[in-house]
Regions:
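Peptidoglycan-targeting cell-wall enzymes and recognition modules
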Residues: 9-10, 93, 98-135, 153-250
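Active-site-adjacent structural elements in enzyme catalytic domains
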Residues: 55-58, 84, 149-163
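Surface-exposed patches in mature extracellular/periplasmic domains of secreted proteins
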Residues: 34-41, 65-69, 143-155, 168-172, ...
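Hydrophobic/aromatic-lined pockets within catalytic cores
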Residues: 27, 61, 141, 145, ...
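Conserved aromatic-histidine-acidic binding/catalytic patches
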Residues: 41, 124, 143-147, 196, ...
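Cell-envelope/ECM-targeting effectors and their regulatory/trafficking segments
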Residues: 1-134, 139, 220-224, 239, ...
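An amphipathic alpha-helical core segment
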Residues: 229-281
Length: 304
């Protein structure tokens, strides 16, 4: 049974994840749509899709109206799910790479950005938002340590939430004011003997806090000298370093002791409880929803 979150077709919200699902269903109902060739499954609603939905509604015996739209709990979706195609069985018209477990090197970043903008229109993907998401996607594709495309989906969902849709590493709001880790401390560079006054409040794609954690991440990532997070905590705001912190931390349980493999293994993904990797179950349901939609888009764009 195929479900959609929002309406598709004439006057619909036409979110790409939903559009792909309906395009696939339409192609499995050629006995009612009268299509001679399948629709291109693109994730973008167009006149061809609207006409096919209308034709399906006109020709299906259980449907009385033809408004050219499929609603999440409507009769048209129920009828589409009956799969009355010529072969009498459901076929997949998704891209061949849709089922791949890992992100591929030929991942279509440009296509993802276009579909993402349609999927999440409340936060327009312009300027630094677009460049930031592009940078993050390229880092995910290049990361040899990511064994599962679902890991990438949950990392993206986490950044979307933690960085408030900016897709840029950010500083903690309030810079630790009133918190124990928000007090300035003096640290000395062992090589140059230069003394720095630093405050170890949250920074990055995910918030790295406390002096000891900055030290530990230096060790984990082999950072020293000018690259040392302990000496130069502002380095956690650089995209490359912020990504390394997030990837290592989420894979190895550096933040809360919980890690990606605790919740996402093979084809199984507990996106709700995966929030425990970062912050208990705070906003877990919201981030779960992001992860599910982002996983679908990642899969759809995982090739050219």
């Amino acid at each position: 049974m195929t479900h959609i979150a929002k309406s598709v077709g004439k006057g619909g919200a036409n979110r790409p994840v939903d559009v792909v699902k309906i395009q696939n269903l339409i192609n499995n109902n050629d006995s009612y749509t009268k299509l001679t060739t399948p629709l291109a499954v693109t994730g973008v609603a167009d006149t061809a899709l609207n006409d096919a939905i209308t034709a399906f509604q006109d020709n299906h015996p259980d449907l009385k109206t033809s408004d050219g739209r499929v609603d999440p709990r409507g009769k048209t979706l129920k009828a589409l799910n009956q799969y009355n195609n010529a072969a009498k069985q459901c076929r997949s018209y998704y891209p061949l790479w849709f089922s791949k477990l890992r992100l591929e090197k030929n991942f279509d970043v440009t296509r993802f950005l276009k579909l993402y903008a349609r999927q999440f229109p409340r936060h327009p993907l312009t300027g630094t938002r677009q460049s930031g998401l592009k940078t993050l996607l390229e880092a995910l594709v290049a990361d040899a340590n990511l064994d599962n495309i679902r890991w990438a989906a949950y990392m993206l969902a986490t950044v979307k939430h933690e960085c408030a849709n900016t897709w840029q590493p950010i500083e903690e709001y309030g810079k630790g004011a009133g918190r124990p880790y928000g007090k300035a401390v003096k640290v000395t560079d062992p090589a140059s003997k230069q003394v720095y006054t630093n405050t170890y409040y949250g920074r990055g794609y995910v918030q790295l806090t406390w002096e000891d954690n900055y030290k530990k991440m230096d060790t984990a990532l082999s950072l020293q000298g000018a690259d040392s997070l302990h000496l130069h905590p502002e380095k956690a705001l650089e995209a490359k370093t912020a990504y390394r912190i997030m990837s290592h931390g989420m894979r190895n349980g550096s933040f809360t002791g919980k890690k990606l493999s605790s919740y996402i293994v093979g084809t199984s993904a507990d996106y709700f409880n995966a929030r425990r990797i970062i912050n208990g179950t705070d906003q877990a349901l919201l981030i779960k929803g992001y992860a599910e939609e982002l996983e679908f888009l990642l899969r759809f764009c995982n090739g050219k």
